[in-house]
Structures are given as structure tokens and as C-alpha cells.
Amino acid sequence: MIIFEKSVPGRKAYRLPDEELQRIDPVFPEHLKRTRPLRLPELSEPDVVRHYTALAEKNYSVDKGFYPLGSCTMKYNPKLNEYVAGLEGFTDIHPYQPWESVQGALQVMYELKEFLCEITGMDEMTLQPAAGAHGELTGMLIVRAYHLSRNDKKRHVALVPDSAHGTNPASAAMAGFDVVEIKSTEDGLVDLEQLENHLNDEIAVLMLTNPNTLGLFEKDIVKIAEKVHQAGALLYYDGANLNAIMGKIKPGEMGFDIVHLNLHKTFSAPHGMGGPGSGPVGVKAFLSEFLPIPIIRKDGDKYYPDFKLPNSIGRTRSFYGNFLVLLKAYVYILSMGKDGLTRASEMAVLNANYLRSLISKFLKIASPGICMHEFVVDGSQFVKETGVKILDVAKRILDYGLHAPTVYFPLIVHEDMMIEPTETENKNTLDYFAKVLEKIVEEAKKTPEVVKTAPHTTPVKRLDDITATKKPVYRYRLS
């Protein structure tokens, strides 16, 4: 029940002061005035508090349990980060203040970008983008600006592997590029021969995730970088899966020219349900002149925003980006240290391989062998044998108090499930998840209707996805 349906005429949660208030009628012309009052819900304060408390209790988050969404890195978010982000020295400042009066905030941003440059092997970094896809668009605008600065106007094509995130081709298209798909080999890696066949003087960039969305490391990345650069194009790194390689190898060492990161994923700021996020973009030195303004610099013991980049693509976000997300990532990096970040990646890979080994006993893994931080289940044979879809399995997982993995992505595997356990889960949790999944597989064979009609214990049961898509209801009519 939505809060509007709980409304009782005349019930109030407030009382206006007795003194006469100045009427504002003269401010608005007649055609802008309402002819009848808004249909706002009328409830008492306890009604409102109980309504939203009940909704909060129905929510699921990583603080409640296992959240193995593949390609999302739903790791635990340390509460130390939240404490620091709540300090009034950070929450009570304003971006319009003179920069001399916010030296602490500027220091945080400067040191964070230096940390991120060190982690990625880049030379300069902007912290402006508000999310991963926003970072992609920023990066692709830099690619365009670079080629135009060389009067290389023929380069209008962005190459994107078929295993890429869906936002990669979308971001490239938004930046004005024509997108061409590169097929993967049977092993799930970039097809070098096909890549070579596509490389010509019209190619602007190859967008790549490494490890890729199958959880596989592109072992030929050095060759790929060489071929792309020989063709005069740039190599773009989607940092969605950086959690697998921190402290082990840097994208800059692989040959990437541009990197975008997801601080809300890899560096532990809470995310999901639309944000807030942060998608910094790092570049090699020869691309730094195109970064958005301002760049945070240091002069002696003073920090300042530098707007003097004549070839900049301009602002891509108001002010300095999502500052409190930047702050949480900064605290995370400081508390973990270099060795801690390396250990986090090691444990992320270990957990993924342990869980993969358990699940491989009763479900097919799309790419046999060692994976990185995540892996993909190929459920096509399972569906043929049982008539139960992977979507049904995901719905049934909810009945066991767990969040479902990502389903039907990447698109190159049919009836698939992408599982990323992250480094913050213990062996007991992984064992329990594997047992739940095995039990559901048995249910699909013996009592398939139980799985097909799941979930059964959640506040909201099986939704009518088709009607919701074709006839969405976006708002409640207030008048």
C-alpha cells in the first residue's frame, strides 16, 4: 500500500503558527494559481514514520545479507567511511566558498586523484563524473577531442567487444561515434584476428574491460594494445572490474590510455537504487589537456582548482563531482593501504573461484577453468532439462533470504547467471549460497512449479514484468 492510500481526510502531522502569515497571492499571475488543492496524503507523524520504517525493513542490502550481483561489486561498506563523511567539517561546506576556506576538502580530492593515478598507472585524473557510465561518456568525449585536435576527422568508429557492458556502446554513441561490435572467441576473449580486420584509419578507440564480463583476464592485452596504437587509435579501460587486479597490475601498464573507475564499487561507497556514485576518469599525460575543468592542483602547501585548460572538453558535472562519495573512497584507500587493496583483490578472486568450484558440481560454468573476481553460469542445458528458466531460479533464491545474482548478462551466454561474491564474504556464506542454489536445482527437477511461481515469502510476489514495461505508472496524480 502506498502512502496516498493511507490518507485520512483532516488528519495532520503539523500545526501552523497562530500568527497571521503574509499571503503570496500577488506574486503569481492568475493562470499559474491552482484551482483546487493538491491531493497530498493526510496522516499523523506516527503514521508517516511507521510507513517508511516498514518500507525500510522490507529493503534488502549488503548490510542484511549476501548480495552476489555480478559486475556490481556489492562489497561491504565500512561504517568508518560513513562516520567521516558525516563530519560537519565536510557536510557544512559549500562549493561556492572561496577555495582558501575549503583547503581540507581540496586536499582530500587532490590526494584521492593521486592515489587513483598510482593504482591505475595514469598520469592525471578528473573526479567530476557522477557514475560509471558518466565516466565513460567523459572518456569518449576526450577521445573525440584528441582526434579532432590532430585534425583526424575520419576517426568516427568505436570498437566494442560483444562481452562489454551495455553502457559502453551507449556512451560511445552519445559521444558521436559509430559503434562496431567485435566478437569473442569460444574461450570468451577478444578475437585478435577479427580485431585486426577491423582496424583502419577510421577507428578512434577500442573500449575494453579487463577482466571482462565473463570474469576472464584478456591474456593478449599487450598485443591488443600494440595493434590498436599502431592503427592510430586509443585504448579505453572500463574500470568496472578493477576489484580483481588492484595491486597486481595497472591498466596503464597494459597499454590503456584512458581509464574510468567506479568508486562506489571498487572503493566501497554504498550504491544501488540509483546512486550516488562516482566515476573518475584518468588519462595518460598526452591526453591531460582535454580533461574537464577544474583539475585540483597543489602549489606548495596550498590546494586550488585549475581552470586554465584551453583544450578542455569543459565541465561534465556541476562543481567537483559527488564529494561525499569521493571522501568515502579516500577513507577506504587510507584505511586499507596498498597491501590491503592487494589483499582485497586476492580474496575477491579466491572467493569467486571457491564458489565457482562448488557450483560447477551441479550447474555448467560458461568458461571452465580459473576465473577472476566473478564467473558466469550457463543455464541453457538446465533450462532444456527442467523447463525452469534462470529467471525463475533467481526469483526462488529470494525465498532463502539472499539477493539474486545478475541474470541474462553478458548477452553472449544464453540463460546465464553472473555471480560476484566479492572479498568481504566468508566461507560459511559462500557454502550456504551454493547449498541453496543446489537445492533449487533439485526443486526444479522434482517440483518445478515451486520454482516457476517463486518468490513465495517476499513482501511482493512475482511481478508482471511485461505489463510494467508496456504500461508503466510513473507517478501518482496529485490534482
Curated annotation (Swiss-Prot):
GO biological process, one term: glycine decarboxylation via glycine cleavage system
UniProt cross-references to Pfam families, sorted A to Z: GcvP2_C, GDC-P
Cellular-component GO terms for this entry: cytosol; glycine cleavage complex
Catalysed transformations (reactions): N(6)-[(R)-lipoyl]-L-lysyl-[glycine-cleavage complex H protein] + glycine + H(+) = N(6)-[(R)-S(8)-aminomethyldihydrolipoyl]-L-lysyl-[glycine-cleavage complex H protein] + CO2
Self-association and partners: The glycine cleavage system is composed of four proteins: P, T, L and H. In this organism, the P 'protein' is a heterodimer of two subunits.
Family: Belongs to the GcvP family. C-terminal subunit subfamily.
Protein purpose: The glycine cleavage system catalyzes the degradation of glycine. The P protein binds the alpha-amino group of glycine through its pyridoxal phosphate cofactor; CO(2) is released and the remaining methylamine moiety is then transferred to the lipoamide cofactor of the H protein.
Protein name stated in the entry: Probable glycine dehydrogenase (decarboxylating) subunit 2
Annotated source species: Pseudothermotoga lettingae (strain ATCC BAA-301 / DSM 14385 / NBRC 107922 / TMO) (Thermotoga lettingae)
Biological classification of the source: Bacteria, Thermotogati, Thermotogota, Thermotogae, Thermotogales
Gene: gcvPB
